[in-house]
């Protein structure tokens, strides 16, 4: 049985700013773009969250909820420096580190001899070391499989940890709401609820063939997670090749204006936020759009583009909408980017000789 730790820094960007300027600690603070340029919130501290401010929210909305919100543009160099220090701390315990972004990672400590091999004590020590050396707090989840470790890291935030031992997995899954499983959004959770599926226990008792017929490949993944199956290993060599966001709609849409509003107000801000966590300069190889129609057929279109660009994505989506929809309702809209190959990127950065 593996010992997996998921470490998630607490409001990371804001925490770095509060550490470097203590006067910011007790006031509502957010990192993001300006409201007049349709900016997006990257993260918010806990005083701001009490007003309802959260990541991926438009800055304009955040300022409506909290007019006295302190807004900073962010210092990506400082965040990257702190992130690198944190990864160096991880490496003192295990070489099996899978970074997910600047502020979170999976660690496999199965073969770690420190702390007598106790994953719980290792997580505590890592969090204490981060606090001592960087004056930042982290939360952690400990479990025998990845998706449960990630869920566990959210259960005792901020500056805490939660352990799910192998013996506790069955009971934990029995009462776990499906909405807590990564990949189950609000619309999907609602559709699951429509057929009586609310917790993992419900899925465990549901016919797999019926689940596959109704939900396709996702049904298989959901069934496995509800059985406590997650065969994914912590992969240090994992290279993220793409970043994407998509929304399954509660009702099919038929007007381009509704699609454009979804892209501008919801999807693009979230895509920019996710991309900035793994590629702060927003440099990419390609960007594209995905539409799924009411008959479950889907289509994608990509453009070669050097930097994430909202106007281009809207133009691509408009073209796909006009040329391929054929009068059908649209049930899902997605945006994605393909990242630059690291080797090619390094070659492009080499000076000419």
From Swiss-Prot:
The active site is at residue 104. The record marks 13 as: Substrate discrimination. Mg(2+) binds at residues 8, 103. The keyword Plastid does not apply. Residues 4-185 form the UmuC domain. It is found in: Cytoplasm. It catalyses: DNA(n) + a 2'-deoxyribonucleoside 5'-triphosphate = DNA(n+1) + diphosphate. Keywords: Cytoplasm, DNA damage, DNA repair, DNA replication, DNA-binding, DNA-directed DNA polymerase, Magnesium, Metal-binding, Mutator protein, Nucleotidyltransferase, Transferase. Its EC number is 2.7.7.7. It holds the Pfam family IMS_HHH_1. GO terms for cellular component: cytosol. Belongs to the DNA polymerase type-Y family. Poorly processive, error-prone DNA polymerase involved in untargeted mutagenesis. Copies undamaged DNA at stalled replication forks, which arise in vivo from mismatched or misaligned primer ends. These misaligned primers can be extended by PolIV. Exhibits no 3'-5' exonuclease (proofreading) activity. May be involved in translesional synthesis, in conjunction with the beta clamp from PolIII. This is DNA polymerase IV. It comes from Serratia proteamaculans (strain 568). The gene is dinB.
């Amino acid at each position: 049985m593996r010992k997996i730790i998921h470490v998630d820094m607490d409001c990371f960007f804001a925490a770095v700013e509060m550490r470097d300027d203590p006067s910011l600690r007790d006031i509502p603070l957010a990192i993001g773009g300006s409201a007049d340029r349709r900016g997006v919130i990257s993260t918010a501290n806990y005083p701001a969250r009490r007003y309802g401010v959260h990541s991926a929210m438009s800055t304009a909305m955040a300022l409506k909820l909290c007019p006295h919100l302190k807004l900073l543009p962010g210092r990506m160099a400082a965040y990257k420096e702190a992130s690198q220090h944190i990864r160096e701390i991880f490496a003192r315990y295990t070489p099996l580190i899978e970074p997910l972004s600047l502020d979170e990672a999976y660690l496999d400590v199965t073969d770690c001899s420190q702390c007598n091999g106790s994953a719980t004590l290792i997580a505590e020590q890592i969090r204490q070391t981060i606090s001592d050396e960087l004056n930042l707090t982290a939360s952690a989840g400990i479990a025998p499989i990845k998706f449960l470790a990630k869920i566990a890291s959210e259960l005792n935030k901020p500056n805490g940890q939660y352990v799910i031992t192998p013996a506790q997995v069955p009971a934990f899954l029995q009462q776990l709401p499906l909405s807590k499983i990564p990949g189950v959004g609000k619309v999907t959770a609602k559709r699951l609820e429509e057929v009586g599926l609310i917790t993992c226990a419900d899925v465990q008792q549901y016919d797999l063939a019926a689940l596959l017929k109704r939900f396709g490949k996702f049904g298989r993944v959901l069934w496995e997670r509800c059985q406590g199956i997650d065969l994914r290993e912590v992969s240090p060599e994992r290279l993220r090749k793409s970043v994407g966001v998509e929304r399954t709609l509660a009702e099919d849409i038929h007007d381009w204006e509704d699609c454009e509003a979804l892209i501008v107000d919801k999807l693009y801000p979230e895509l920019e936020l996710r991309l900035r966590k793994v590629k702060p300069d927003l440099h990419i190889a390609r960007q594209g759009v995905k539409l799924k129609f009411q008959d479950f057929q889907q289509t994608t279109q990509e453009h070669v583009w050097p930097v994430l660009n909202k106007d281009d994505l809207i133009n691509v989506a408009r073209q796909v909408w006009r040329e391929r929809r054929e009068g059908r309702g649209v049930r899902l809209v997605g945006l994605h980017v393909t990242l630059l190959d690291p080797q090619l990127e390094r070659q492009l950065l080499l000076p000419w000789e």
